[in-house]
Design a protein with these regions (language model features):
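Conserved short alpha-helical segments that host acidic/polar catalytic motifs at enzyme active sites
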Residues: 1-250, 262-295, 334, 429, ...
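Hydrophobic alpha-helical scaffolding
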Residues: 7-10, 100, 120, 135-139, ...
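Glycine-rich oxoanion-binding loops at beta->alpha junctions
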Residues: 67, 71-84, 275-288, 312-348, ...
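Acidic/histidine-rich
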Residues: 153-187, 459, 464-490, 527, ...
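Generic C-terminus detector
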Residues: 253, 544, 557-559, 569-610
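Active-site phosphate/pyrophosphate-binding segments
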Residues: 260-264, 268-298, 388-517, 590-610
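Glycine-rich phosphate-binding loops that contact phosphosugars or nucleotide phosphates
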Residues: 292-441, 521-565, 585, 593
Length: 610
């Protein structure tokens, strides 16, 4: 993984591929490369470790001319980041070039088989096996060779391939990894993600698992593995191409933090009736009997989406009174879970392509569970695999660290909890009306937080040099603390941990010492007294406490060194507000430390391998 592009047409392929790869930089990567079928049908490969600019310099110094090519940005899974491990990979005879997202799980026995035949490998990757297999199995027909090669490999993949003997054709296929074909006039495009091609075309085919695509300048043919034609509707992309630009902000992350009021408004749009008395989820169309038949809810996700799931557990159990279990997706499928037909499995994924989450979804469905996907990407794997889907209308999120996707996930999940409660009759009508009214005000309330950004920036500048930080909270605040901790560590590289306030005495207090920053969330009235005791405990050890509470909380201000107040609202809506200053605090701490905010080290935006 991470990003794939391909071009065939009348332009110089290298120009498009460098442009497209730049649009995929948000995924995170450690190297980049291109392969172009040029003069005399020779495949010329150029690849370089590091930023895309390194590859661009190589291409500028040694132009790569031709009208058909494939490109890739890599995030290492097999083999260290290096020039030789970068994609594309070629066969020894130079006939084939391949780019690949995913993992070839049986690459080692295949490699041993090829080594025994005298094939020489030049990289440590699993992908190179595919190039050599194509060469070893070549029967003079590119397409039939690809189909037979696919019978040999196991795992997850998006594969895009060219053959020097058939220089007017690109062949691509996928399994459990995203792939899209863009349609032009006298030219066509291939990419792992729509942003790579949106400036060239809005007419696309979203490729499904086990489909094989044959692309020429004037045609796109889609078949199944056996070669039978597949009929597919054209998907028209409605995104604004400018949505992927920074819009005057220094970083995508800051831009996306400030886009949250609009993203929240868009996610709420049409989902609350005029009187704020009902949630309207037309895309679900569930019945009271169906919801009453749900005995248990399983939420599974990874990273930030997992933290959204933890908040949702409180939402659903309190408002709909249905038991909820939250699982890390990578753990769920390996523990023989107790999932059955009375279970509703909710999977959360910004991209809709997260490999572990997709695997968990498939396992839950295999065990008989009903399934619901919550994702930000129309046509994504989650949206296709789940029985039903709720979209968060956050728009493209470019920065690796998720911000607006998280807050819109919380909005969608709070609406879902209310929706479940109104269908099974377990939600209090007054509570429902209060929540829905406050949700309608949420975009404006989020804007208010930005009025205090200078104060947050000052805290970050003052404490950004610290190497450790702790986050505390109780109930929903604990789940938000976990997200705040993740944001701080992933972009500023400050070691940060989140703890439930009641766990302090069970070990954490041993780590509290003079001058260590503690961010204490105190928005939940039901545990106020306990949380104040926890704050006093860390203050007694000379910690520097930044309290996060709602406006007018004079008691909190007495016990902490600094306060960050968010607008006053109800206990269910406030987590969506409380996370915003934590995002800003993390952002400015990273700036203070000179970190690469949009592309933190060792991380990828969309994790499409297990």
């Amino acid at each position: 993984m991470c990003g794939i592009v391909g071009y065939i047409g009348f332009e110089n392929a290298a120009d498009f591929m460098l442009e497209g790869l730049e649009k995929l930089e948000y995924h995170g990567y450690d190297s980049a490369g291109i392969a172009v079928v040029g003069e005399n049908n020779v495949i010329k490969v150029q690849k370089k470790m590091g930023r895309l600019a390194n590859l661009e310099a190589v291409v500028k110094a040694d132009p790569n001319q031709g009208h058909i090519g494939i490109g890739h940005t890599r995030w290492a899974t097999h083999g260290r980041p290096s020039d030789m491990n970068a994609h594309p990979h070629t066969s020894t005879d130079g006939k084939f070039a391949v780019v690949h997202n995913g993992i070839i799980e049986n690459y080692m026995p295949l490699k041993e088989e090829l080594l025994a035949k005298g094939v020489e490998f030049t990289s440590e990757t699993d992908t190179e096996v595919v190039a050599h297999l194509l060469s070893d199995m070549y029967d003079g027909n590119f397409e039939s060779t690809v189909r037979r090669m696919l019978e040999r490999i196991e795992g997850s993949y998006s594969l895009v391939m060219v053959c020097a003997d058939e220089p007017n054709k690109i062949i691509a296929t996928k399994k459990d990894n995203p792939l899209v074909v863009g349609l032009g006039k006298g030219e066509n495009f291939i990419a792992s993600d729509i942003p790579a091609i949106i400036q060239r075309t809005r007419e696309t085919y979203i490729i499904n698992d086990n489909e094989v695509v044959i692309v020429t300048p004037d045609s796109v043919t889609i078949t199944d593995r056996a070669g039978q034609p597949v009929q597919k509707d054209i998907y028209h992309v409605t995104w604004n191409a400018e949505a992927a630009e920074k819009g005057g902000y220094e970083h995508f992350m800051l831009k996306e933090i400030y886009e949250q009021p609009k993203a929240i408004r868009d996610t709420l749009s049409g989902r609350i009736n005029k009187d704020a008395t009902e949630v309207v989820y037309d895309e679900l169309n569930w019945t009271p009997d169906m919801v009453k038949g749900i005995k248990r809810i399983l939420i599974t996700a990874c990273g930030t989406a997992y933290h959204a799931g933890l908040v949702a557990k409180y939402y659903i159990e309190q408002l709909a009174r249905i038991p909820v279990e939250v699982d890390i997706a990578s753990e769920y499928r390996y523990r023989t879970p107790l999932t059955d037909e009375d279970t509703l499995c909710i999977v959360i994924s910004q991209s809709g392509e997260t490999s572990d989450t997709l695997s968990a979804l498939k396992e839950a469905k295999r065990l008989g569970a009903k399934s619901l996907g919550i994702t930000n990407v129309v046509g994504s794997a989650v949206s296709r695999e789940a029985d039903q889907v709720i979209y968060t209308w956050a728009g493209p999120e470019i920065a690796v660290a998720s911000t607006k996707a998280y807050t819109t996930q919380l909005v969608a999940l709070l609406l879902l909890a209310v929706y479940l409660g109104q269908l099974n009759g377990r939600i209090d009508e007054a509570v429902k009306h209060e929540i829905l009214t406050n949700l309608q005000e949420l975009p404006a309330l989020t804007h208010e937080i930005f009025e205090n950004v200078d104060e947050i920036k000052a805290f970050a500048n003052h404490y950004g040099y610290k190497e450790d930080a702790f986050f505390l909270g109780r109930l929903i605040d604990y789940a938000v603390a976990m997200e705040g901790s993740l944001k701080l560590k992933e972009i500023s590289y400050i070691h940060a941990e989140a703890y439930a306030g009641g766990e302090l005495k069970h070990g954490t207090l041993a780590l509290i010492e003079e001058g260590i920053p503690v961010i204490a969330l105190a928005t939940q009235e039901s545990v106020r007294e306990k949380m104040m005791s926890n704050i006093k405990e860390v203050k007694a050890r000379d910690a520097i406490v930044i309290g996060v509470g709602m406006k007018g909380d004079e008691e909190l201000a007495k016990y902490v060194d600094h306060t960050i107040f968010v607008p006053k609202t109800d206990a269910f809506t406030v987590p969506i507000l409380a996370v915003v200053p934590l995002q800003l605090l993390s952002y400015y701490a990273a700036i203070t430390r000179g970190a690469d905010v949009d592309k933190p080290r060792n991380l990828a935006k969309s994790v499409t391998v297990e």
